């Protein structure tokens, strides 16, 4: 049996045919920037054909409550690259939960996970990055112990099924919430 890496099209199909159809939400690639648009159906746009972008944007959707899912981009602010220290600290605070879920999704399909600081102005030696990585790992550990939120678990389960179908190198198939 050979393993292959997942494609953006497979991620889209997996989401749209599992949790997406149930929740009236579609996942679409090809966007120049990720964006969530409420409507009928709600649409999660991810960047170009980047699988990590797809998983990250689905993680944000899984974190957003029903009220936030009625707002464009869940009502979040976004400061572009070049954030100052206080903006970067705020970014870290809101990114812990979605990036912990993203790690679970990445492991379900055998994709390497690294935190994203989403700011080219941040020095890789900045101690805040290590603190952020630790916070994401702590949250991920909590998910391993306590299980994923319902929508995230449904999507993770679908990813695991696709991993089996397409022979992706899943490293997480039986560890979380099962």
Q: Where are the predicted features?
A:
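Helix-loop segments that flank and shape redox-cofactor active sites
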Residues: 35-42, 76-78
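Post-HEXXH active-site segment of zinc metalloproteases
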Residues: 63-96, 114-123
């Amino acid at each position: 049996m050979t393993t292959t890496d997942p494609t953006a099209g497979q991620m889209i199909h997996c989401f749209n045919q599992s949790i997406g159809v149930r929740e009236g939400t579609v996942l679409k690639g090809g966007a120049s920037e990720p964006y969530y648009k409420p409507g009928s159906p709600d649409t999660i746009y991810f960047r170009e054909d980047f699988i990590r972008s797809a998983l990250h944007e689905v993680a944000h959707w899984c974190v957003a409550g029903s009220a936030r899912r009625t707002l464009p981009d869940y009502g979040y602010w976004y400061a572009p690259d070049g954030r100052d220290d206080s903006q970067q600290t705020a970014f870290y605070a809101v990114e812990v939960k979605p990036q912990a879920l993203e790690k679970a999704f990445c492991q379900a399909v055998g994709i390497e996970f690294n935190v994203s600081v989403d700011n080219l102005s941040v020095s890789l030696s900045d101690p805040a990055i290590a603190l952020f990585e630790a916070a994401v790992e702590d949250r991920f550990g909590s998910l391993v112990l306590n299980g994923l939120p319902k929508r995230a678990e449904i999507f993770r389960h679908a990813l695991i099924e696709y991993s089996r179908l397409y022979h992706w190198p899943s490293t997480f198939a039986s560890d979380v919430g099962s």
